[in-house]
Design a protein with these regions (language model features):
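A compositional/biophysical signature of low hydrophobicity enriched in polar/charged and small residues
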Residues: 1-96
C-alpha cells in the first residue's frame, strides 16, 4: 500500500458550493473506501491549498480516484507519493 498526500484547491465551481464541501468529502471517502483506499486524514487549510488529504492504497486505485475527483469539477489536485520511515530506511539502505 502506498501513502498519498493530496493537495487540493477549490475551482470556481467548488468555491461557489463551498458549504457542501463536508458532504462532498464524505462522498469522496465512501468512493475511496469502495476502491480499497483508506482516507487517513483530511484538513481544510489556509495558505496555498484549500485542503490536504492523506490516503493509503494501491497506486492504480489512487490514480483512478484522483481522476474521478478531478472530473467532478470542484477541486484541482496535486498528489504526492509519501514514504514512511521504514520505506525510507529500505531505500537509503540500497545506497552502497
Amino acid at each position: 500500500m502506498s501513502a498519498h498526500i493530496i493537495l487540493a484547491n477549490f475551482t470556481d465551481q467548488g468555491a461557489r458550493a463551498i458549504k457542501d464541501s463536508p458532504e462532498r468529502f464524505e462522498a469522496f471517502k465512501a468512493l475511496a473506501e469502495g476502491a480499497g483506499i483508506t482516507v487517513k486524514s483530511v484538513h481544510w487549510t489556509t495558505g496555498a491549498y484549500d485542503m490536504v488529504l492523506v490516503t493509503e492504497g494501491p497506486e492504480e486505485a489512487a490514480m483512478t480516484l484522483n481522476m474521478k475527483m478531478a472530473s467532478l469539477g470542484n477541486v484541482r489536485t496535486q498528489t504526492l507519493r509519501g514514504y514512511d520511515a521504514a520505506e525510507m530506511r529500505r531505500m537509503v539502505g540500497k545506497l552502497k
